[in-house]
């Protein structure tokens, strides 16, 4: 709904606004290990500390997260206010969070009272098959804030993003948004593309090329570095290799 969307200058501004609205200096944010490298300076600029949770083939290790939250409670440490993750075609790991873990993560957020910042940047760049429901779609509307952008879907210079959240949260973010506003020209152009179904059409055109690039990279790793453990993604831009 229109009242649940705040337009931003890309996803990074959305992440920054969320940090400024909810984090006090020195407070921790939960992130995956590894995580989106460009998000790290945003958290650092907001004086956040990090609680890193590992990943496996099914995405963020929710068992490890639950154990970490329990250990912090035993030590008398506060529950982190924010958890940041990219559940679809993770940057840089290429992983997708399983449906079972999405539900468990949502339940943990509700039980412990933290907010999930769901970065949906790569969600629409799917190579094949049906997508999983987003964390925000699984939520009751109170524990998930979604950030998105057209930069990865259409063009890097198209700095049009948005945050989807309940109106009360968006009011807090809008009060901090003092950049003069996202370019009306770019917003109008993005609106026209969206209204005409141009996103789906563009993604359908570029997916075969992205699949070709992925397959070439995977072949290269398997030929030149056969001992590497490779994540072969079903979407997005990233192949992750461990040696």
Language-model-detected regions and their locations in the chain:
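Feature representing long, continuous alpha-helical segments
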Residues: 63, 103, 171, 187-188, ...
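Surface-exposed helix-capping loop/turn segments at secondary-structure junctions
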Residues: 1, 201, 221-231
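Conserved glycine-rich beta-strand-loop-beta hairpin in the small C-terminal domain of fold type I
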Residues: 208-218, 228-242
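Conserved core segment of the aminotransferase class I/II
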Residues: 140-208
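Conserved core of the PLP fold type I
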Residues: 1-112, 123-141
């Amino acid at each position: 709904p229109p009242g649940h969307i705040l337009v931003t200058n890309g996803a990074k501004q959305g992440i920054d606004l969320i940090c400024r609205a909810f984090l006090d200096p020195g407070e921790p944010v939960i992130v995956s290990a590894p995580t989106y490298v460009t998000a790290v300076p945003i958290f650092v600029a907001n004086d956040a500390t990090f609680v890193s949770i590992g990943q496996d083939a099914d995405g963020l290790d929710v068992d490890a997260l639950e154990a970490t939250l329990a250990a912090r409670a035993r030590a008398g440490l506060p529950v982190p206010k924010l958890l940041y993750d990219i559940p679809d075609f993770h940057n840089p790991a290429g992983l997708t969070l399983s449906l079972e873990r999405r539900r468990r993560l949502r339940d943990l957020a509700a039980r412990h009272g933290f907010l999930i910042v769901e970065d949906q940047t790569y969600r629409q760049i799917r190579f094949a098959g049906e997508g999983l429901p987003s964390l925000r779609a699984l939520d009751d509307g109170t524990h998930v804030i979604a950030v998105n952008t057209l930069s990865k879907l259409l063009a890097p210079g198209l700095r049009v993003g948005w945050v989807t959240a309940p109106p009360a949260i968006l009011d807090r973010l809008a009060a901090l948004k003092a950049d003069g506003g996202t370019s009306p020209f770019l917003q109008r152009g993005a609106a026209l593309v969206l209204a005409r179904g141009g996103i789906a059409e563009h993604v359908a055109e570029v997916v075969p090329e992205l699949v070709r690039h992925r397959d070439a990279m995977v072949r290269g790793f398997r030929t030149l570095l056969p001992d590497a453990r490779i994540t072969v993604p079903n979407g997005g831009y990233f192949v992750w290799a461990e040696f």
